[in-house]
């Protein structure tokens, strides 16, 4: 399953942009 983004490099687009901070 995908990680949950706590910080993304594109706001609101965690699924199509890279996470800068993730938790599983």
UniProtKB/Swiss-Prot annotation:
Cd(2+) 2 binds at residues 5, 22. Cd(2+) 4 binds at residues 8, 19. GO terms for molecular function: metal chelating activity. Cd(2+) 6 binds at residues 10, 17. Contains 4 disulfide bonds. Cd(2+) 3 binds at residues 5, 19. Disulfide bonds: none annotated. Keywords: Cadmium, Disulfide bond, Metal-binding, Metal-thiolate cluster. Cd(2+) 5 binds at residues 8, 17. Induction: By cadmium. Cd(2+) 1 binds at residues 3, 22. Metallothioneins have a high content of cysteine residues that bind various heavy metals. Belongs to the metallothionein superfamily. Type 8 family. This is Metallothionein. It comes from Neonectria lugdunensis (Aquatic fungus).
